[in-house]
Amino acid sequence: MGLSPVEAKEVLYQAIDYLGLGRVFPFFKATNDILTARGVDLPLASQATTTMENRLEKGEETQIRLFGPQMKDFAKKGTINKCLVDNCFGDYYTRKGLDDRDREMVTFCYIAAQGGCEPQLLAHAQTNIKLGNDKEFLMKIIEQNVPFIGHSRSLNAVTVVNQADEAVNGKD
């Protein structure tokens, strides 16, 4: 079982806000080359669901739906906050092609790979758990990523998942 062409591209689009376009851009060419070699017609149908006019509103709705009512007016707290709401959540989280569970799982992997982003990793671990990607699932994801992100970042991610599970589900 692999990813469909749309899913593969959505995994890349999701990476932009977490890894940065500079790190992700080369993978678009490689992915396009692979898809073309497999006979996939490019460009793929757009998965976008927002416009420049409604991306902030839709981003805030998505952020509140996933992270809770405390995210209301988050965009008003600074320029980077606004960018997070309208670009990350308005442009990417609202796209078709990946459901919330898959999009959050991918996001969890990207943040864990960064290291030093534990507050964000905790928020996304909690949201993963609330969406059904439970502690056991996230631990398996971390184990599969050890060769790619190393032991230190993996151990940090394990600590964060334990904290997230306790926050969402209470103590065992």
Regions found by a protein language model. Give the residues of each.
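Glycine/small-residue-rich hydrophobic helix-like segments
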Residues: A112-E136
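Short, structured motif recognition centered on aromatic/hydrophobic residues
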Residues: V11-L12, D102-A112, L121, L138-I142
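Acidic, glycine/proline-rich low-complexity segments that act as flexible tails and inter-domain linkers
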Residues: M1, V6-E7, I16-D17, R23-D102, ...
